[in-house]
């Protein structure tokens, strides 16, 4: 079930709905799977010329981990196929945006008082 306030998005794949989200643990698993830091992963998904299907599958797999822990990387590939690659990419993007909301207000945190 989708809950954008908690950072989760629904992905419909065939007759099943899956919940996607990117917690710290999910992002760590994604970094380990792709052997890249999250900043590089984000840059890669923002450039369609760099986007690989293996990365899409890994992104879907990692996004599923919080709510569907038993899903394997191959299961994630089947789910991506059933949902449609474009729909899966869009939903993963939404889940990433919820995990990394833009900072509002001040751009720098307040400095600690010296003492």
Task: Mark where each language-model region is.
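Short capping micro-motif at the N-terminus of alpha-helices
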Residues: 20-22
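Short, surface-exposed, low-complexity cationic segments
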Residues: 24-41
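Hydrophobic (often cysteine-bearing) scaffold residues that line and stabilize catalytic clefts
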Residues: 52, 56
């Amino acid at each position: 079930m989708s809950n954008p306030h908690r950072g989760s998005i629904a992905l419909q794949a065939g007759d099943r709905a899956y919940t996607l989200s990117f917690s710290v643990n999910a992002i760590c698993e994604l970094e380990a799977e792709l052997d890249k830091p999250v900043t590089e992963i984000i840059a890669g998904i923002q450039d369609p010329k760099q986007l690989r299907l293996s990365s899409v599958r890994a992104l879907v797999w990692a996004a599923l981990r919080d709510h569907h822990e038993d899903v394997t990387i191959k299961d994630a590939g089947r789910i991506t196929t059933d949902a449609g690659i474009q729909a899966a990419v869009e939903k993963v993007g939404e889940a990433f945006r919820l995990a990394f909301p833009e900072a509002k207000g001040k751009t720098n945190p307040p400095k600690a008082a010296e003492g």
